[in-house]
Amino acid sequence: MEEKNKILLKRLLIAVLIIVIISIVATIGIGNYFVNYAILRTGNGGDREVKNADSIAVANIDNEAEKIIEENKKNEKQLANEWSETIENKKVEVKAKDGITLRGTQYIKDESSNKWAIILHGYRSTPNSIISIGMHFSKEGYNVLIPSMRACSESDGEYIGMGWLDKEDLQCWINLIIKQNENAEIILHGSSMGAATVLMASGEDLPTNVKAIVADSGYTSVWDIFASEAKARFNLPTFPILNMFEIVANVRANYDIKEASALEQVKNSKTPILFIHGDADDFVPEYMCEELYEAANCKKDKLIIHDAGHTDSKYKEPETYYNKIFEFLGNI
């Protein structure tokens, strides 16, 4: 009987060992796949094909709204390109805390002005995608800094920071402006991942030079947006996929996607925040904006634009969009 128990115990241990090995191999394989896909600089996470549209509960944008958005987008792009070619500008760079070089462009409206705006682009995007926002700030008398986010466009870096690493990079850009002008009054504007960045930064100990934040289409947390996209793109459950992703991302990219939460950070914000979102956003659901707004423990306001998709509020109703921003900034 004792011999039989030993055999059973041995078999059990072997079975457990096999399960552990399979789990480790699966975690390494699946985790690496999704890290490569989602946050590796050379990954193809920017090619978004929705396989489960039912997981994204948004209203369809009507044809008239689409026409308005496309026409305004075309006009804004042309005007912004003309603006960027005529205004004084210079290339600048900073070293991030982890040693990589970050690059950006400053557009100088008035060298003697204290008014500055830092404009941040979105996931796998470029400064050119948001240059029209810089143009509008410039028209209001702001000097403008538009950086390339880490692992995007002109900046170095192997892994996209999803806002969490970028909040530290943003501090470097803020410090650069303050070094140039110790009396600078700085506005932070971010779109999509850029919005997540400024919201995540809001909970940090920001210099008093930072006067306000504008977050357009920001997500609540890295975990939440990846969970939403895993369902939409692959029709996959959160567990165990994201858990495997989390483990590998911690090792390779050096940040925890569970810790990377804009929702938690805005609870500690002392900086006024304006939240903007389109009610037809099929990438970052509108409810995330509502949750962020409710959680923010600071002076705040929000603008929801009807029939606007992801970061398209500025094209759907440009006058409303910019009037709201500068009205908010005028009241802080």
Task: Name each model feature, range by range.
Residues E2-E71:
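N-terminal membrane-anchoring alpha-helices
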Residues E70-S112:
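N-terminal cap/lid segment of alpha/beta-hydrolase-fold proteins
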Residues I133, A262, T271, P285-E294:
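Short alpha-helix in the alpha/beta-hydrolase fold that links the catalytic acid
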Residues G134-D156:
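Conserved alpha/beta-hydrolase
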Residues I160-N181:
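Alpha/beta-hydrolase active-site loop
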Residues M200-D256:
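Hydrolase active-site cap/lid region
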Residues N268-K270, F275-H277, D281:
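Short beta-strand/loop motif that positions the catalytic acidic residue
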Residues Y293-T311, P318:
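Catalytic histidine neighborhood in serine/cysteine hydrolases
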